[in-house]
């Protein structure tokens, strides 16, 4: 794990290498007048095309040797590194081949901080690299052959491996031990720009592999942080002298990271998306975790709210949201639409929806999620003008027989 300790030096060397081995670059085509398409994502991209492009970016950009087209609307599934690199990959690609699904969100850096493939050369994260995908390029080539749109998921601030290796980047108890939540998970601090750089370098490598979108997850402080803020020890870094209260400082740090990541990835011609708690859209900003829905949305191409019915209290007046997937998603979509409509250039909305059971909610039999429950969520989104969605199942076991066809 000592590779973490010397990673800033490695970063400098790596940047020198980048300068000498960067893949071919191409001159941008003459700017054409953008044509608005049918989908919200294409409309968003057309608006971006009208913005002034810095000269350096207009002339040079990364060119991948893989070719993926953005689908009519992303309808995707979550895929672990193990699934992508194992026998389950074929099952999941067949699911997409045989339905209206068209995309995969694949773990590149997972929840505990492990990177899901071994890099070809020594990199700052080599010490936490696992061989789940022996050849990620081969995985992407298979997706290219099948026309499946690839998204790289990178878990950012929940990172037990980095927190334990570098307590100075984390939150510690009074005895100096790294803090962990009830599940034994530790976080690194959004205030630390070294953490930003570490994660964005992983994102850049994913883009170089051929992923067309980088999805950042756990872009936040630990849940309930406002209750332990005074108890934990951590370095505010450059935010120590910012004239804001602690809640606003957390919001600024999280938002600044998203803005930084977006700018750093411009060269790679990838979309940037962020996963965010659904309830963040219902309040101005979350006091503990530092998420401001509007501010994050202003800095991404795609916003993916996690709106699993099982994760809601009776917020919308629905006593048991887990058993009312249509009502829950319908009510949420109305709220989110209002928030996004207030932005000058709103991102594409692509929520995460539920394809799993929630036994922790029940003392007796668990409410089952099947075809009707999954289709109900999609119907609610479509009826509110939201064409894109992602299915979450932690073990990648998705309901068979679902009709994913969009509403006319």
Question: Where in the sequence are the language-model features?
Answer:
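Aromatic- and acidic-residue-enriched segments that line the glycan-binding/catalytic groove
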Residues: 117-127, 159-181, 219-241, 291, ...
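Aromatic-lined carbohydrate-recognition surfaces of secreted/lumenal glycan-active proteins
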Residues: 78, 151-159, 215-218, 248-288, ...
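Aromatic-lined carbohydrate-binding/catalytic grooves of carbohydrate-active enzymes
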Residues: 99-133, 226-234, 405
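Catalytic domains of carbohydrate-active enzymes, especially glycoside hydrolases
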Residues: 88-114, 208-216, 302-304, 381-389
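Substrate-binding cleft of secreted/luminal carbohydrate-active enzymes
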Residues: 33, 300-314, 325-330, 335-408
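Glycine-rich, aromatic-flanked loop segments that form ligand/cofactor-binding clefts
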Residues: 103-105, 135-180, 213-218
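Sec-dependent signal peptide cleavage junction
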Residues: 19-32
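Active-site-adjacent "subsite" loops/lids of carbohydrate-active enzymes
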Residues: 63-84, 157-208, 375
